[in-house]
Amino acid sequence: AVHLCDVGAGAGFPSLPLKIMNPQMKITILEPLNKRVVFLKEVCREIQLDNVECLNVRAEDYAKEHRESFDLVTARAVANLRVLSELCLPLVKKNGIFVAMKGAAGFEEQAEAEKATKILGAELEKAEEVHLQDGSARVNLTYRKVRTTPPQYPRAYAKIKKSPL
């Protein structure tokens, strides 16, 4: 079964809808805000979703012991892609996929993050603009992990934020 990690899941998007559509999928949610973790655990209990682990932890801390252990990592509305890629790509298995769900500025972020994603071992596989019913644009960036992430990444969050790759 596919093992998905959702970084900064917030209210559970996209991980919970993906789990509902793919019941065999194993989900690990990393969420630094405990009140969101409590909410997500309650939602999973209420709608009887099994094989969903909701953890109150930061991605860069979790990655220390769970490097390259996920087939698919998703993130939506977490951080700028230069920061986000360092939080997420160390978690992705070699040949796995990282999907960054970005706003309308996604293409600009992708260009700015090109060096970072390369250093971290990923190549852009697809950049897709989608339009919501209200007319607003979103950009989904899909990366394939082609090389192992160098062991010094991810750095501490303060370092990532202060000097993104």
State each model region's role:
Residues 1-79, 85-86:
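Conserved SAM/SAH cofactor-binding pocket of Class I
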Residues 36-38, 106, 110:
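Short alpha-helix immediately C-terminal to the canonical SAM-binding loop
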Residues 111-165:
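SAM/dcSAM-binding transferase cores
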